[in-house]
Amino acid sequence: MLQNIRIVLVETSHTGNMGSVARAMKTMGLTNLWLVNPLVKPDSQAIALAAGASDVIGNASIVDTLDEALAGCSLVVGTSARSRTLPWPMLDPRECGLKSVSEATHAPVAIVFGRERVGLTNDELQKCHYHVAIAANPEYSSLNLAMAVQVIAYEVRMAWLASQDAQTPAPGEEETPYPLVDDLERFYGHLEQVLLSTGFIRPNHPGQVMNKLRRLFTRARPESQELNILRGMLASIESSRNEKP
């Protein structure tokens, strides 16, 4: 089940950080590392700092875009160290661990970490169902990339160990089929297309409304069947408009 949890690093600029992250992951039983458009490729320094976790580096998936790293996932959590102009559903690391383990039993989960200096962009954070923030000392809250991964990975492991001891899963948690990220992105594209065709949003300025709608649906988190209903509603609107003389 832990193999279903992806640790995703976006545009990492130092190979030593890749190695340190691999070490942090493996100590907690995580091995599924994804590198999105790394500014440098893993090298001997990454292997050296992995300190016995070189297999995690060697088996890492290297992709060009975040969308590729999130493909097939039903849950995406993005790390964020600061509040944004558009509030988003938040988790603390413990909640992140519990939710990740719960959902990884039936579909891949991605926990996304941003660039060393600037983190994730707003557009990248909007691809996430939740954001997670580590409650560090406000007077000195600087965590390097591997430290942040270690904190989250520890909470994932604690949640996984607790799930092994539990006699039965929480009611309904494993039975809820949530849509994959790919399906959600297709829905958002379909929604924007319909709203443009009806004149509800302007072609030159769709962003603000679409961002707020993303936030609304992220907060509501529709199940797969509910998303199918929404897609059907959009298709019905398109059909009705096409039938008009």
Curated annotation (Swiss-Prot):
Enzyme class: transferase
Keywords: Cytoplasm, Methyltransferase, S-adenosyl-L-methionine, Transferase, tRNA processing
Principal localisation: cytoplasm
Entry's Gene Ontology BP terms: tRNA nucleoside ribose methylation
Chain's role: Catalyzes the formation of 2'O-methylated cytidine (Cm32) or 2'O-methylated uridine (Um32) at position 32 in tRNA.
Family assignment from sequence similarity: Belongs to the class IV-like SAM-binding methyltransferase superfamily. RNA methyltransferase TrmH family.
Name of the protein this chain belongs to: tRNA (cytidine/uridine-2'-O-)-methyltransferase TrmJ
Taxonomic classification: Bacteria, Pseudomonadati, Pseudomonadota, Gammaproteobacteria, Enterobacterales
